[in-house]
């Protein structure tokens, strides 16, 4: 499979997490390609039984498509762990490197890497690393945006975008850190959280990309 097709598969998977319906327009925007290019790729992927058309959701990954996406995430996240633990990369540097390397490493390399790293369960951003042959099921899947009550929470996963990681680094908020959700302002769609004695205003766009767990 070509790297381009692999990127399309990941894109469709990620849109399906964020939005109710996956459209050609949204795929084109995220992939930064023309709508005709998306149409052509969609035809190929449908013919290869990677995706199927769905009236409500736009497109759905087939079992084969989800299997391939899971393998890609496994490669990507193991590479991220290696870069942080063995090459002293920071968490905001690893995503782009892993994006390139995930398309080039062999299955044997990934197996050896997994063993070298001690079979890690999560990547530096808190994302689940599926075991060999298993489908990706995120362990940390409660977004801050869905929190309904004030209280103590722990940051368990973040989307690995440069802007989000830079925002968290600026405020010294990292995976595993605890913080207080003080209130939610429905008018401005903003959470007020207390982290390390600092009040932070977190808008809904950011809150959708931060995953948490309640601390009892």
Label the predicted regions.
Residues 18-26:
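Short acidic, hydrophobic short linear motifs in intrinsically disordered regions
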Residues 29, 46-47:
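Alpha-helical residues within the helix-turn-helix
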Residues 36, 92:
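Key DNA-contact positions within bacterial/archaeal DNA-binding proteins
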Residues 42-43:
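Short, hydrophobic-biased segments on the C-terminal half of alpha helices
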Residues 47-54:
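A short, conserved structural fragment
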Residues 57-76:
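Basic, amphipathic "hinge/linker" alpha-helix immediately C-terminal to the N-terminal HTH DNA-binding motif
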Residues 102-209:
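Mid-protein regulatory/catalytic core that forms ligand/cofactor-binding pockets
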């Amino acid at each position: 499979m070509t790297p381009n097709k692999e990127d399309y598969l990941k894109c469709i998977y990620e849109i399906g997490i964020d939005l109710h319906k996956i459209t050609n327009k949204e795929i084109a925007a995220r992939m930064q390609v023309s709508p005709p290019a998306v149409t052509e790729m969609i035809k190929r992927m449908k013919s290869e039984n990677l995706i199927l058309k769905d009236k409500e959701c736009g497109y759905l990954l087939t079992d084969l498509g989800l299997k391939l996406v899971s393998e890609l995430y496994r490669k990507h996240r193991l590479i991220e762990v290696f870069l942080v633990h063995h090459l002293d990369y920071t968490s905001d540097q690893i995503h782009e490197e892993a994006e390139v390397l995930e398309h080039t490493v062999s299955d044997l390399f990934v197996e050896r890497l997994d063993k070298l790293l001690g079979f890690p369960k999560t990547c530096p951003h808190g994302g689940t690393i599926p075991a060999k042959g298993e489908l990706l099921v995120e362990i940390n899947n409660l977004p801050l945006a869905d929190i309904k009550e004030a209280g103590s929470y722990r940051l368990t996963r973040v989307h690995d975008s440069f802007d989000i990681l830079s925002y968290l680094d600026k405020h010294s908020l990292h995976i595993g850190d605890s913080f207080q959700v003080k209130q939610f302002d429905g008018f401005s769609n903003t959470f007020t959280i207390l982290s390390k004695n600092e009040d932070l205003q977190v808008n809904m766009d950011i809150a959708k990309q931060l995953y948490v767990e309640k601390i009892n």
